[in-house]
Amino acid sequence: MSWISPELIEILLTVLKAVVILLVVVTCGAFMSFGERRLLGLFQNRYGPNRVGWGGSLQLVADMIKMFFKEDWIPKFSDRVIFTLAPMIAFTSLLLAFAIVPVSPGWVVADLNIGILFFLMMAGLAVYAVLFAGWSSNNKYSLLGAMRASAQTLSYEVFLGLSLMGVVAQAGSFNMTDIVNSQAHVWNVIPQFFGFITFAIAGVAVCHRHPFDQPEAEQELADGYHIEYSGMKFGLFFVGEYIGIVTISALMVTLFFGGWQGPLLPPFIWFALKTAFFMMMFILIRASLPRPRYDQVMSFGWKICLPLTLINLLVTAAVILWQAQ
C-alpha cells in the first residue's frame, strides 16, 4: 500500500469533512422550511403543517416528492442556458461560503487566510443568480424583481463588508479560526455591538428575507424574479434561501459570539445551539415585522446603516491606536 501517502490521506480527510459539513448545511436548510411553518403557526395562534406523518413530521418528505414530480417548465422565449444556470448559482454560492466557517477546532473545510473576503465574494456571486433569473425569464415582473434584488443586495453588501472590518481590525486577521480564537476572553459582540447590529440587518437583506423581501413581494411583483420557475429549479431557489440563512447565522456566531467556545458542552454542540438561536430569530423577524416600501429600505441602508458602520470602524481604529500607545 505504498501509494497511500500522507498527502493523499490529508486530501481524503478534507473531502470527507467537506461532504459531511455541506450535507449537514443542506439538511438544516431543508428542515428549517418545515420548522419555520410550525413556528409561524405557533406565533400566529394557528396550526402549522400537521397532517403528513406524526405531528407533520413527514411534511418535508412530501414536499420533496411533490417538487421532484412537478413539471420542469421553461418559458418559450427565455434564454434556456442562463435560465437553467441561475438556480444552480443561487444554491451553491452561499453553500460554498459555509466552507470557511469553523464549526469546532480543526473542523473547517477551507481554513483560508482571506476567509472573510471569500465570504463577501460568494455573497456577491449570488447577485448574478438573481440577475440571470430575472433577465432570462423574459417576464416583466421577473425583470423588475431582479432589478430590485440586485440593487438591494449590492447596497447592503457594502454595509455587510464594512461591519466586518471592525472585527478584522480587532483580531488582526481575515482568518475565521483566528477571529474565533481572539474571542477567548470577550466576545466581539460587546466591543463591536454596532457592527453586529449592522451585520445582522445586512445579512437579512442579503438573504432577501422579510422585511427585506421586496424583490419577491407577491402583492407587487407576483413572486418576483423566480415567477417563471417550477419543479426542481424552483426548489433550488427555495432551499438556497434557507441555506443562506444557515450561513449568515453561522457567521454571526463565528464573528461575534465566540464561535464554538463555551463551558461544559462539546464545541460542536455550542456552535449548533448558537446557530439554531439565530435561525429562530430570522423566523421571529418574519412573524413580527411588516414589509416597508422599497424606497424606505434603500433609504434606511444608506442613511442609517452606512453612517453606523463608518462610525463603528472609526471608533474601533481609535481604540486600537490608543491601546498601542
UniProtKB/Swiss-Prot annotation:
Enzyme class: translocase
GO biological process, one term: aerobic respiration
Residues making up the signal peptide according to the UniProt record: none
InterPro entries: NADH_UbQ_OxRdtase_su1/FPO (IPR001694), NADH_UbQ_OxRdtase_su1_CS (IPR018086)
GO molecular function list: NADH dehydrogenase activity; oxidoreductase activity, acting on NAD(P)H, quinone or similar compound as acceptor; quinone binding
Subcellular compartments: Cell inner membrane
Its EC number(s): 7.1.1.-
SUBUNIT field: NDH-1 is composed of 13 different subunits. Subunits NuoA, H, J, K, L, M, N constitute the membrane sector of the complex.
Described purpose of this protein according to its UniProt entry: NDH-1 shuttles electrons from NADH, via FMN and iron-sulfur (Fe-S) centers, to quinones in the respiratory chain. The immediate electron acceptor for the enzyme in this species is believed to be ubiquinone. Couples the redox reaction to proton translocation (for every two electrons transferred, four hydrogen ions are translocated across the cytoplasmic membrane), and thus conserves the redox energy in a proton gradient. This subunit may bind ubiquinone.
Family statement drawn from the similarity comment of this UniProt entry: Belongs to the complex I subunit 1 family.
Identification of the protein by name: NADH-quinone oxidoreductase subunit H
Annotated gene: nuoH
